[in-house]
Amino acid sequence: MKVFKNLFLLAVSAAVSVCANAQQSGIDSTGLPGDNFSLQGALEMFQKAASPEDFEKLINEENNNVNNLDLNGDGDVDYVKVIDKVDKEVHALVLQVSVSETENQDIAVIEIEKTGDENAILQIIGDEDIYGEQVIVEPASEDGGAFNFYGGSTHSGPSADAVQQRNGIVANVWLWPSVRFIYAPAYRPWISPWRWHLYPVWWKPWKPYAWHVWHPRVVVFQRPFVVVRTHRVVRAHAIYKPLRVTSATVHTRHAASVNHYRVTRTKTTHTGPGGTTIRTTTTVKKNGHLKGKKTTVRRRR
């Protein structure tokens, strides 16, 4: 009995410690719907998945800690469906939620282009109605899995000049199983068969987690992926842009938090001596206190 009591007290102490660390970490929720969907987590699931169908299942499994969205406020987490928009060797995999019987809302889109026989690039872009602005995330380039990208052509080996606009050293995702799958000759574009109140039998909605519980679960995804400000996959983005789907319900319900985010997040860019570009980004917390300030310097070559 004494051993059981000690184990119980130890478990309670550990739980309290985890909760306290999350609350005292200084990381505040933005109040945006995007707080509850991990773009980095979605990319990790896509990297693991064997196909778009498998990817859809992975992002909707509770224990994978990718999705915690409740866009319509019904108290249950939403099911995220995947729809592949294809034009030749360009793919735009749309991640979308059925908000009601008549409305859908795009959460993000994974844009993919094949740039060579054994080269492909991708980015995931969070929707501005969900994240307050377009948030672009891509795999971090790694030695042996990266190549120089020059707006559509590829060159092996590093290059210090490949840094402006679409050019750069990017991760090659050609060996990801799901990427190979969608470029197979027999592939038929995946269009999720599920819709409002019609979901797969394996999926059961759960109650959304509170921020202090949810956030520690998703931070583990952030290291292999980076947030960038450059659209590299421009052909896929051009295909997706006119097909973007938004919901009036989501826009109305979250308009205040989205507008507040856009007002409090300021960006200042100016050009210094020698053509040096300096960008300063300031984000203010919901309580009006300064959350963070980042300055990026890019020198013209």
Language-model features, listed with the residues they occupy:
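N-terminal post-signal-peptidase region of extra-cytosolic proteins
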Residues: 58-68, 92-97
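Low-complexity segments
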Residues: 99-274
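Beta-strand-dominated extracellular/periplasmic modules and repeats
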Residues: 87-88, 109
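Short N-terminal segments immediately surrounding and downstream of signal-peptide cleavage
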Residues: 24-44
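Extracytoplasmic low-complexity, disordered linker/stalk tracts in cell-surface/secreted proteins
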Residues: 1-4, 9, 259-301
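Acidic, glycine-anchored loop motifs typical of Ca2+
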Residues: 67-79
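Bacterial Sec-dependent N-terminal signal peptides
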Residues: 1-24, 208
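Extracellular/luminal recognition modules and glycoprotein regions
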Residues: 38-61
